[in-house]
C-alpha cells in the first residue's frame, strides 16, 4: 500500500475512533462548530446563496462561544476532549 493510500485509510478510520472516546456533548459540539466554520468560510455573490449562508451561520454558530467555554471548563480533566476543544477559536460570534 502506498503512503497516500495508508493516509486515506487513516483519515477514514480515525474520526469515528476519536468520536468514540469523546463525551457525547463534545462530539455534538464538534459537529455543530465544524458546520459553523464551514459557513464562516463561505463567500458568495448570489443573493439566494448569501441568504442560505446567513441561515447556516445563525443555526450553527450562535451560542457556540459560550458552549465552547462551558465545555472547556466541564471537561478540563479529560485530555482527549480538551485537545479537540482547544482547536476552536474562542470567539466566532
Model-identified regions with their sequence ranges:
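Bacterial N-terminal signal peptides that target proteins for export
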Residues: 1-7
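Single-residue recognition of alpha-helix capping/boundary positions
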Residues: 5, 25-26, 49
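Short S/T/G/P-rich N-terminal loop/turn motif that feeds into the first structured element of a domain
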Residues: 10-11
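N-terminal signal peptide c-region/cleavage motif recognized by signal peptidases
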Residues: 14-16
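Cleaved targeting-peptide boundary
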Residues: 19-27
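Compact alpha-helical subdomains of small soluble proteins
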Residues: 40-93
Amino acid at each position: 500500500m502506498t503512503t497516500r493510500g495508508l493516509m486515506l485509510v487513516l483519515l477514514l478510520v480515525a474520526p469515528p475512533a476519536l468520536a468514540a472516546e469523546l463525551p457525547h456533548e463534545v462530539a455534538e459540539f464538534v459537529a455543530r462548530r465544524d458546520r459553523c466554520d464551514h459557513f464562516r468560510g463561505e463567500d458568495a455573490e448570489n443573493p439566494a446563496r448569501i441568504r442560505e449562508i446567513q441561515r447556516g451561520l445563525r443555526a450553527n454558530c450562535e451560542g457556540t462561544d459560550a458552549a465552547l467555554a462551558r465545555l472547556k471548563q466541564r471537561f478540563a480533566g479529560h485530555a482527549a476532549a480538551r485537545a479537540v476543544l482547544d482547536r476552536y477559536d474562542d470567539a466566532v460570534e
